[in-house]
């Protein structure tokens, strides 16, 4: 319960959450984790952690590569199930499905209100997230100098993958910790058209986009003292 509370508070105050210490401790010597350890990793992800970290398992353990692979497998399996349930839940909210929501009872409630975030930014991210879900967008793109808007999007735990665009190297590194956010560097002072062109080229080259896919972009155009006040839909 304490872990869940700490994660919830960190989300509210825009702090990335890393769950660590003895998560797969038995794998220092064993080639397989215990069921309890597997459950611990899965629960950390379902609680809303941005990352899980290994320590002794890789520092002094007998199977460092194997333990990293095991944590990756547990994380991917858990996230896959989580995102499938989120998609079903969003479909129900948007009236796309008549399936009951009982199966989604275990899902953590997304932390939508982020402490200290500009209210315009918060409202635009909220609305754009719903648009992305309703239009089955392929990517949700956030242009952010500080990375705070990417955190706000991350806390939605949306099923649409998020791309964080920034020209700041420090922000680029920070965004690697944000749940569901893939950081991508862009040229300095790029305008909206340049951002769309850059992310479209990146997506096509990396197999993340195809012609005809939709992108939802959240960016600022100078209104509201740092607030991100613009959301737009772009078709590749």
Functional labels for PLM-detected ranges:
Residues 1-23, 69-86:
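Alpha-helix-loop-beta-strand connector modules within alpha/beta enzyme cores
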Residues 25-47:
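Catalytic cores of alpha/beta
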Residues 17-21, 45, 52-54, 162:
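Hydrophobic faces of well-ordered beta-strands that scaffold small-molecule active sites
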Residues 201, 207-223, 228-234:
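C-terminal binding/interaction regions
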Residues 12, 72-127:
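Long, charged amphipathic helices and adjacent flexible linkers at domain junctions
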Residues 41-64:
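Glycine-rich phosphate-binding active-site loops on the catalytic face of alpha/beta enzymes
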Residues 58-81, 229-234:
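C-terminal helical cap(s) of enzyme catalytic domains, especially alpha/beta-barrels
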């Amino acid at each position: 319960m304490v872990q869940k509370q700490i994660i919830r508070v960190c989300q509210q105050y825009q702090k990335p959450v890393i769950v660590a210490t003895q998560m797969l401790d038995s794998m220092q010597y064993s080639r397989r984790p215990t069921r309890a350890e597997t459950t611990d990793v899965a629960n950390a992800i379902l609680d809303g952690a941005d990352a899980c970290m290994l320590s002794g398992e890789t520092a002094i353990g007998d199977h460092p590569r194997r333990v990293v692979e095991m944590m990756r497998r547990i994380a991917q399996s858990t996230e896959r199930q989580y995102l499938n349930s989120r998609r079903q839940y969003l479909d129900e909210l948007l009236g796309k499905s008549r399936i009951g929501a009982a199966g989604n009872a275990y899902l953590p409630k997304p932390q939508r209100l982020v402490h200290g975030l500009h209210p315009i930014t918060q409202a635009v991210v909220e609305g754009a997230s719903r648009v992305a879900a309703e239009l089955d967008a392929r990517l949700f793109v956030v242009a952010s100098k500080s990375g705070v808007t990417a955190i706000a999007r991350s806390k939605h735990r949306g099923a649409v993958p998020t791309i964080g665009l920034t020209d700041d190297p420090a922000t680029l590194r920070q965004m690697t910790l944000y749940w569901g956010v893939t950081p991508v560097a862009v040229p300095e002072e790029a305008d909206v058209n340049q951002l769309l062109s850059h992310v479209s080229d990146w997506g096509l080259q990396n197999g993340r986009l195809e012609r005809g896919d939709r992108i939802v972009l959240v960016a600022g155009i100078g209104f509201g003292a740092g607030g991100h006040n613009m959301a737009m839909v772009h078709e590749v």
